[in-house]
Amino acid sequence: MAATFALHGWWRTS
């Protein structure tokens, strides 16, 4: 769960 946001959410939220 957190891994998805760690490598697929850092640029998505930027």
Curated annotation (Swiss-Prot):
**In its keyword annotation, does this UniProt entry include Amino-acid biosynthesis?**
yes
Database matches in InterPro entries: Leader_Trp_op
Gene Ontology BP, a term = L-tryptophan biosynthetic process
Q: Which UniProt keywords apply?
A: Amino-acid biosynthesis, Aromatic amino acid biosynthesis, Leader peptide, Tryptophan biosynthesis
A Pfam family reported for this protein in Swiss-Prot or TrEMBL: Leader_Trp
What does this protein's UniProt record list under function?
This protein is involved in control of the biosynthesis of tryptophan.
- Name this protein carries in UniProt: trp operon leader peptide
Native organism taxonomy: Bacteria, Pseudomonadati, Pseudomonadota, Gammaproteobacteria, Enterobacterales
Give the gene name. trpL
